[in-house]
Amino acid sequence: MIAKGYTNIWVLDISANAIEKAKQRLGESASKIHWIVADVTDFEPPVQFDFWHDRAAFHFLTTEEKINKYVSIAEDAIKENGYLILGTFSENGPTKCSGLGVKQYSEHSMSAKFEVGFNRIKCVTEDHQTPFNTIQNFVFCSFKKK
């Protein structure tokens, strides 16, 4: 994204180690990014975003309290007519990841979680090949903020 001229990029991860690896991979370009180490359900964004992309964090939220908190944060943090892209394990995907339980979603169940504040654009379900040569079934949905 940086190479394409995007600015005001924020990256949030619960893992400081993951953030450090990403910074090292980006080299000098890492200084152009706002890096946040936090649990997304504790995140209080100081700005609103045009675009929010989450690939494989949402499915680690397994309680209704955490799920609802995430949805509320996304609704508040994304600008009107902004976009939300989510990728989670599908109902045919793994039930655990990195030793942790996950919540699986269908295109319908994920859309239902966000229907109050967002209009669904499109959902697709697809297989993802991991670096360990295993297959994981994901559902990806895109939404537009109402």
Question: Where are the language model's segments positioned?
Answer:
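A conserved beta-strand element that flanks and buttresses the S-adenosyl-L-methionine
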Residues: H53
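Short catalytic micro-motifs in class I SAM-dependent methyltransferases
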Residues: A56-F60
